[in-house]
Amino acid sequence: MLQGLLPVSLLLSVAVSAIKELPGVKKYEVVYPIRLHPLHKREAKEPEQQEQFETELKYKMTINGKIAVLYLKKNKNLLAPGYTETYYNSTGKEITTSPQIMDDCYYQGHILNEKVSDASISTCRGLRGYFSQGDQRYFIEPLSPIHRDGQEHALFKYNPDEKNYDSTCGMDGVLWAHDLQQNIALPATKLVKLKDRKVQEHEKYIEYYLVLDNGEFKRYNENQDEIRKRVFEMANYVNMLYKKLNTHVALVGMEIWTDKDKIKITPNASFTLENFSKWRGSVLSRRKRHDIAQLITATELAGTTVGLAFMSTMCSPYSVGVVQDHSDNLLRVAGTMAHEMGHNFGMFHDDYSCKCPSTICVMDKALSFYIPTDFSSCSRLSYDKFFEDKLSNCLFNAPLPTDIISTPICGNQLVEMGEDCDCGTSEECTNICCDAKTCKIKATFQCALGECCEKCQFKKAGMVCRPAKDECDLPEMCNGKSGNCPDDRFQVNGFPCHHGKGHCLMGTCPTLQEQCTELWGPGTEVADKSCYNRNEGGSKYGYCRRVDDTLIPCKANDTMCGKLFCQGGSDNLPWKGRIVTFLTCKTFDPEDTSQEIGMVANGTKCGDNKVCINAECVDIEKAYKSTNCSSKCKGHAVCDHELQCQCEEGWIPPDCDDSSVVFHFSIVVGVLFPMAVIFVVVAMVIRHQSSREKQKKDQRPLSTTGTRPHKQKRKPQMVKAVQPQEMSQMKPHVYDLPVEGNEPPASFHKDTNALPPTVFKDNPVSTPKDSNPKA
């Protein structure tokens, strides 16, 4: 046989008819990847069984006449904790399962000894996926359905010569319609600076949910296993791309509409996106927690559009996108998925001002032809700016070790059950506190990570690990027993904020002024109170609640809790609907009635000690049950938003009756008091000696009348040296000491970091905006 005559690593220039010719691929060759087995493995296992549990793999092949070793590491972040799959039986009944995915064969990696290289590979049935070597990119696919070591693979060399704009993103045109400019940050009218975070250094976690329509189900012969493998490979590639932004993309669930579509899907991308967004809000969000959902459809979208998403809406009710399955090459579809997700992060299409480190970047408008491998400078800037928005907090919730359902693997940079830490492989690990081989904390050390871990030791109890960001936040302190900072806590709901103009609610300070600014932009003011009387009318221009299609008018006491009325600002809104103005009053009537755009938010102040709750103006006590909650806390503690007692800054949890400030105070007193006594005694001795010397200088020899003066010999004076122990026994003169009871008060240096005065910052926090700024 030919294979027996040639080295298995030899690359043959042979045409392979079994593989479709791909756009941008001029030729393909055959290669026989050989798996390099680690020498330290002692257990003899079948190749399939061994690979199923291998954390790392290496394959050797010849590329351009040189031996190359492809290093692969299992992507354990592909599936999030609690991953579920949903489908429907023939009667339309919803069935949700939590399958144990046995084909754990999705890897990422690179070519060893290459400065620029990455890879996204599936090893389920041979090697299938993408890898790069320097500036050259390759696609690899098996030629045989039989999985064995050394089997032949097709290696595609990807050399695009020119751009093809046959398929694009549906965002073009929409951008300009809303008067936005590409690669310019949106006005931060509702943004809260996360000054205590270095966004680039913190890992982010995207909980990703994918829905496949009925057309997709039929396209892949109603084979759920085939669909699952394709989806996992696409998600693996999306994850590889976003890891370049220090962000993990993990699937929390997949849904296949096996019986029929749950929404109306048409070639109109905007219409389909709106329908999917409504379904997600009314059905999916109530069933499954996630950060973003995308619909993969087999329907061919109108024109050249293959994807559409709402702009800058991650972590909001409009964090959705629609992607057409426009190519047999799943990596091209994965590139579109990453592209539309980028729009959710506020990324615009790349233009001439953007620098791309590779041939093509994720936010290029030519979606279907190119397969992106990196993010441009503009995309990275937009991504960083997005994290100035408090809505982005949903991306910092890393999975707990107890929630991870996969088998713990040391070296995957994910702390799992039984592990103290996981800093990657021995080559990757930079954490001096963690043993990379065992994923345990090194001997004599207490911790390896966390805000309360410093130089591998726990920080002292009472030290602030997360300062209060604003007046509706609470500082968190270390407890001296863990390296982790406690969960973020907020001021008790109803706490006054913004100089009494609002009351805190879940860490925000909702006010009418902030909501007007969010809706209409800078320069907006709250309309006169007389405008709010229109809410008693019960028309679409003023009401309190909507029940089905019926508008419920406000009661006289609730008029400040219905429609939001403002004046001034811009009339250029990113939502469909009507702008209604009369006198100096302005409000918005949205076309989409499923979202309460232009309504006064819950928690907004509507009177003295009153807030809006579900369109009613109620007492704070009725709304939050928080009156006098802090009086029930022991020690120096206050109530938080969940009516739990939290220590005030500077007081040690959990009892909050011991302060590190008192500890430092006692040290200061113990050291300074003896020194002060010694100083006073020494000063008095010096003063006494100086006084005697002065008296001697003032003395003159006495003369008898009529007698010549004569010289007198001065008798030398002996000065006794005072030893330290004798100095302490000397008694100063009474007049050198203050009279008892008239001493000045003791003054000690105040540690302003430990006990700051209560200051209400003029820095209000906005409520998350429940709107869909679509670009």
UniProtKB/Swiss-Prot annotation:
Expression sites (tissue/organ): Expressed predominantly in secondary lymphoid tissues, such as lymph node, spleen, small intestine, stomach, colon, appendix and trachea. The lymphocyte population is responsible for expression of this protein in these tissues. Isoform 2 is expressed preferentially in spleen.
Biased composition (Basic and acidic residues): 690-700
Cofactor or coenzyme needed: Zn(2+)
EC number of the protein: 3.4.24.-
Residues making up the signal peptide according to the UniProt record: 1-18
GO molecular function terms listed in the Swiss-Prot or TrEMBL record: immunoglobulin receptor binding; metal ion binding; metalloendopeptidase activity; metallopeptidase activity
Topology, Cytoplasmic side: 687-775
Motif Cysteine switch location, chain numbering: 167-174
Record propeptide residues: 19-198
Glycosylation (residues): N268, N275, N557, N602, N628
Record-annotated disulphide pairs: C315-C394, C354-C378, C356-C361, C465-C485, C629-C639, C633-C645, C647-C656
Ranges facing Extracellular side: 199-665
Residues reported in the UniProt entry to bind Zn(2+): C169, H339, H343, H349
Keyword Cytoplasm included in the entry's annotation: no
GO biological process terms, semicolon-separated: proteolysis; spermatogenesis
UniProt KW keywords: Cell membrane, Cleavage on pair of basic residues, Disulfide bond, EGF-like domain, Glycoprotein, Hydrolase, Membrane, Metal-binding, Metalloprotease, Protease, Secreted, Signal, Transmembrane, Transmembrane helix, Zinc, Zymogen
Annotated catalytic residues: E340
Cofactor detail note: Binds 1 zinc ion per subunit.
TM stretches of this protein: 666-686
SMART domains, sorted: ACR, DISIN
Pfam families recorded: ADAM_CR, Disintegrin, Pep_M12B_propep, Reprolysin
Domain Peptidase M12B residues, every copy: 204-399
Function: May play a role in the adhesive and proteolytic events that occur during lymphocyte emigration or may function in ectodomain shedding of lymphocyte surface target proteins, such as FASL and CD40L. May be involved in sperm maturation.
Protein name, entry field: Disintegrin and metalloproteinase domain-containing protein 28
